[in-house]
């Protein structure tokens, strides 16, 4: 899950009130965990998109440009590839758990992309799928089926709703689904029950991930007393990452006074012991 720590630090610096304050129903530690878990869900979906594209490529399909449109409006497709003379467009989501507003937005977005594709490809050459990877949650199947049928009727283009293995059966490679299930079962055994919020456990990699954040982010982070008192002790309980950042800022002092300012701020935090032990008030 690349850049997860970097994204979290940036969010804390920009929106500290989401993590601290009297009017939050959770303590900072719980909010950080919640943020990381939500981030994992999003990044898992992104990873599946990349993985599936690799599978399509290995199967010999021609991967096409995912960004389509012109002028000020561009649309990004989840999957699009060519097999023989057929163009496959797939709108891919992990699970069918959308509420009424999101499911309507999903269909609207799907139609908009089909409309854009029809300006590039012929109706008869297109096969368009709404695909939910997880077959265990089928919340809006009736709605999506009805809406896809309407799109098929109005645009005269092939549309299909698929869950889990169904997509791979559509492209005549069900063995890929079985391989994916086997991989996921092994992966689930390896991953921890909960993500670690002690970034000092992997200090070097954490430092490498966050060191190039904009200096304005670090400035916001280190100038906020509540963040320094309530958040940094949770993320950096042993000061390992903070010490690496301090060394890094000192090495860059010749590039601007802001780096001296940041170095002084970090040294102040370390010397006060605000990162010495987790504070989970």
Question: What does each model-found stretch correspond to?
Answer:
Residues 39, 67, 75-78, 113-118:
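Short secondary-structure capping micro-motifs at structural edges
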Residues 73, 80-90:
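Active-site beta-strand-loop-beta-strand hairpin of nuclease catalytic cores
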Residues 66-68, 89-93:
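Secondary-structure boundary/capping motif
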Residues 93-154:
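Catalytic cores of nucleic-acid endonucleases
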Residues 150-281:
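Non-catalytic C-terminal interaction segments of nucleic acid-processing enzymes
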Residues 1-59:
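Interdomain/boundary linker segments immediately adjacent to catalytic/signaling cores
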Residues 58-62, 83-86, 119-126:
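Secondary-structure boundary elements
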Residues 53-73, 79:
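A short acidic/basic microdomain associated with nuclease active sites
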């Amino acid at each position: 899950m690349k850049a997860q720590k970097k994204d979290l630090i940036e969010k804390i610096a920009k929106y500290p009130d989401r993590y601290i304050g009297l009017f939050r129903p959770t303590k900072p530690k719980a909010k950080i965990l919640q943020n990381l878990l939500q981030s994992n869900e999003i990044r898992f979906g992104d990873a599946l998109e990349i993985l599936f594209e690799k599978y399509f490529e290995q199967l010999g399909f021609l991967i096409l440009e995912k960004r389509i449109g012109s002028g000020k409006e561009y649309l990004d497709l989840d999957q699009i590839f060519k097999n023989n003379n057929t163009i496959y467009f797939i709108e891919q989501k992990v699970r069918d758990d959308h509420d009424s507003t999101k499911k309507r937005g999903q269909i609207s977005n799907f139609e908009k992309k089909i409309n854009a594709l029809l300006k590039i490809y012929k109706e008869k050459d297109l096969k368009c799928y709404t695909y939910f990877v997880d077959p265990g949650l089928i919340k809006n199947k009736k709605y999506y089926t009805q809406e896809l049928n309407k799109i098929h009727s109005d645009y005269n283009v092939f549309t299909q709703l698929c869950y889990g293995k169904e997509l791979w059966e559509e492209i005549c490679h069900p063995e890929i689904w079985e391989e994916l299930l086997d991989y996921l079962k092994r992966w689930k055994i390896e991953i921890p029950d909960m993500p670690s919020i002690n970034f000092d456990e992997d200090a070097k990699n954490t430092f490498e991930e966050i060191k190039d954040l904009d200096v304005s982010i670090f400035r916001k982070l280190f100038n906020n007393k509540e963040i320094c008192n309530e958040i940094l002790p949770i993320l950096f309980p042993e000061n390992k990452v903070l010490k690496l950042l301090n060394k890094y800022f000192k090495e860059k002092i010749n590039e601007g006074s802001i780096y001296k300012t940041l170095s002084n701020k970090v040294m102040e935090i370390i010397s006060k012991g605000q990162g010495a032990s987790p504070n989970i008030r």
